[in-house]
């Protein structure tokens, strides 16, 4: 190999090591007992088979390693970048365990070749000091340790010859089972190592002969102790994932983890002396069942990650950055945030290339650049509107130009703007799940935003957004903006088929069903279908439910539908929010107002006090109505009296007959001119 190429590779590794120390271009975050290490995935994958298998799906992220590796993981990371491994007699066992767990064969070979520096008397002695203690020999590898001195360990792996062995060493021999007294010699010692590392038969396995470390399913995950080799790997995503949530697509990754941690039936070195022996027996036998979330039924590898996952249902974010105040569900996310040095990012400024003006946010710079270019980056292809962000253009195309929403529900074909909205829709509408639970009252919400609105409105009584027209308060500004449209008359949602506009997207969706003929809400008792859910509920309550389950607590009146009860309660409260624009009369229901407006369409100058006469049609101002009174009480004025229509009721059918008096003269003092009068005989028992 050419020497210049070797120097080039060394220089590249040196530059990568410098980048690692500065935290530049590092796409891997390693959390080891609270210590965060930055590294390059490519270097980790080249040096460790474990990291290579973990990155096999091509997704980076954060890896959480056990706290017991915190003291020696920096040595292994330095070995990845420099080839130097600083071993001592105190850290050799821990480095060997970590190298085996992470599957770093070169580091394992160096640890096996390492031998602490001993005195001449001990080197030539017989049974007094040959080799390390038996507890360490049992944990050694099959290969016999070579005579590598302590001060010679900090060298590159390429300079360590494989054929160098101490002068007194021999090839490993099969141990003599009938002579246990000869176990002090080097060859018999290596034979014991081989015998200890031979796989145990299934029928001969005993806890004292073959100690198998527990699988990671038993790991509590909260704080891993130094004496346990249980550990878990968590690939962290942007939105504070659920940690060790076990789903079907992750089965391959789970198998990889189990293959990494499962070891042959042999006694492995512990992170601290006697830790494996002190381990509870119930943790050494069998495999624990994954814990399940009682709310959404997701399964997790440990109780710790279930506890973290429950914070998503409650909205709790206990880990707050002391510098910028940002909160996180998990401590690992906070550590990663702090490793990125949030204050330096907040102090970053963006400079305009034209006028050199500086801005604290990139979005402010984009808005400023419009003053120079006169154009926004995103333009609508159907109209002349422009937008600063792509999502605003997408929302504009959907609302005004009828563009389809990108994420469709496979069950009901309803579409959504984001994948998160689709997932919440599937969980709430099709699976009946309300994943977010209020800790104070147990109220369940289908979204985190809905839970926060509930807490603000019910428990904190926070309504900071007040309408400037009617002083009505809201918990969210979006609700206030929607309410303001009732005052301003704004209707931003337009039907792309007929051009009709609406205040809300929900109203537009209901209107679109008039074009498509869609009736998605079907009755489970009959074949009738509805365009909205409200009419379906009223139909079921009135047609298919027996009794009147909803009753008023004020007067005790019962109703079939809860909506009828709500309207009735408004009467007790004096609420009549549907007002007639012609006469000012108010109603409790909009249907009553629509029926009332029909009177104004056929009768002019309608007075609400004349509601009892609404069945009579008056055609002329000179006309007056003659009520059905006894003839003795009938008063006639100086105008023509024409009764066009009598009130429809039981009285009209009881009239015996009518008498028409035409061109007759009246001498009464109250009659000034001849009139045409229609009279009727009224029974005496009528008290109308």
Swiss-Prot record:
Binding residues annotated for Zn(2+) 1, in chain numbering: 293, 296, 309, 313
Binding residues for Zn(2+) 3: 352, 355, 368, 372
Binding site for Zn(2+) 5: 552, 555, 568, 596
GO CC aspect terms: chromosome, telomeric region; nucleus
Sequence ranges of Polar residues compositional bias: 170-186
Region called Disordered, residue ranges: 119-140, 161-192
Compartments it resides in: Nucleus; Chromosome, Telomere
Zinc finger (CCHC-type): 319-344
One protein family per Pfam: zf-C2H2
Domain spans labelled BTB: 26-89
ZnF (C2H2-type) residues: 291-313, 350-372, 378-401, 407-430, 436-459, 465-487, 493-515, 521-544, 550-572, 578-600
GO biological-process terms attached to the record: positive regulation of DNA-templated transcription; regulation of RNA metabolic process; regulation of transcription by RNA polymerase II; telomere maintenance via telomere lengthening
Positions with a binding annotation for Zn(2+) 4: 380, 383, 396, 401
Family membership noted in the UniProt record: Belongs to the krueppel C2H2-type zinc-finger protein family.
Protein name: Zinc finger and BTB domain-containing protein 48
